[in-house]
């Protein structure tokens, strides 16, 4: 059995297959040797957690699963074969009896002039660390310039996309810049300007309005400028233009507009729904009894809302990964397959500091109580490093971390060449 991808869906599929098909040979193909717990990525960018805390070793946690480091380049569904390139560009291939597609998603990049060249993506450890270095550098450079306009521009940060990621990045980022500025006497009276923009009419448009209102209130109270119903029209190296026509001088455009299914899906030439593979309620790909799909790359029918598909969330991916393991094992035995059914446990948004918005089991919460629930859920959901993560949080509560650069940002911010700031 071959699993493509090691996100929430792929990781849980591999864990389940070890249990439900202990005698099967399980091969996982993934570009990295770790599972990334994406919900805590904003805390890495803000210097609150070390990258290792949310990077869980696959060889350590998935004993009995063969990990192949590589990026899948081609899947032959007729001959049951998967081909890949390893990190050094060497080709490889393997045949399969059952295939689980859990390739996940990548940054959604819109055709807006300058975004690919000058915006910063936020989907990987590398991007989070790069962004942290970039923000730290901007403030340190602002502290040494006598040019007021340049200082203001370097202390201005624009986040586009007010979903989960964008809202949390703006919340954590604003607190991070305030913390860094306190280390720099020259910035003691310098405002840290953060703007959060989205074409929707409110923050967190996919969540309950009460959670949106909580996030809006917390961020505005901290001075974050909320710009709903608008986005970016053009981005340059030191400024951007909003769709309202306003020009904003900034060196920091952070792109959190959303995600799209991994491009691997497009090359399969199978039926899709909004770019996601069409599957039955049992997670079997339509017309391919030996192929299963789950997570962000699969358009799984939502039985609680007939006619719609499940959202691209970690909660769904985790549950679908567990179900796909049971169904793959059942298909090998010739047993009936289970349909995907779910009951939402609620949603959580960490707003930094002691603030959060949550509705566990549809019970609305905010403030420290929501924060406790949010962190408790993350500790429960982390497949590893729970103790170290909890200790980091405890220490940071009394001893705030100091910000330093790690040298990831090259001269003129060109650590990556133009057009490659977005990693997949």
Feature map (PLM): residue ranges:
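Glycine-rich, N-terminal phosphate-binding loop of Rossmann-like dinucleotide-binding domains
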Residues: 6, 86, 103-104, 244, ...
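FAD-site-proximal beta/loop scaffold in flavoenzymes
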Residues: 117-147, 238-241, 247-319
